[in-house]
């Protein structure tokens, strides 16, 4: 438990991996900075019509890197 708490303070927390999680982009908040696109190692995001889109949701490992780098809070992960 303590290591989990310390991990949070160190910014190393991971999102609980569950198959029922869905990732989306809130386009009311998204500034199209491409941070999520650049940080994702699993090619979850793509650029379509000059916008970042979720292209390969099945590739998402729920690592949380895109959530961490999004300064605008535009990445949403929720239960299906």
Swiss-Prot record:
Q: What is the lineage of its organism?
A: Archaea, Methanobacteriati, Methanobacteriota, Methanomada group, Methanococci
Q: Which InterPro entries match?
A: 4Fe4S_Fe-S-bd, Fe-S_Ferredoxin
Key word Aminoacyl-tRNA synthetase present in the record? Answer: no
Gene3D superfamilies this protein is in? 3.30.70.20
Cofactor binding mode and count: Binds 2 [4Fe-4S] clusters.
Per UniProt, residues of the 4Fe-4S ferredoxin-type domain are: 21-49, 50-80
* PROSITE patterns membership: 4FE4S_FER_2
Query: Which Pfam families does this UniProt record tie to the protein?
Result: Fer4_9
Name of protein:
Uncharacterized ferredoxin MJ0061
Molecular function via GO: 4 iron, 4 sulfur cluster binding; metal ion binding
Which cofactors are reported in the record for this sequence? [4Fe-4S] cluster
Q: Which UniProt keywords apply?
A: 4Fe-4S, Electron transport, Iron, Iron-sulfur, Metal-binding, Repeat, Transport
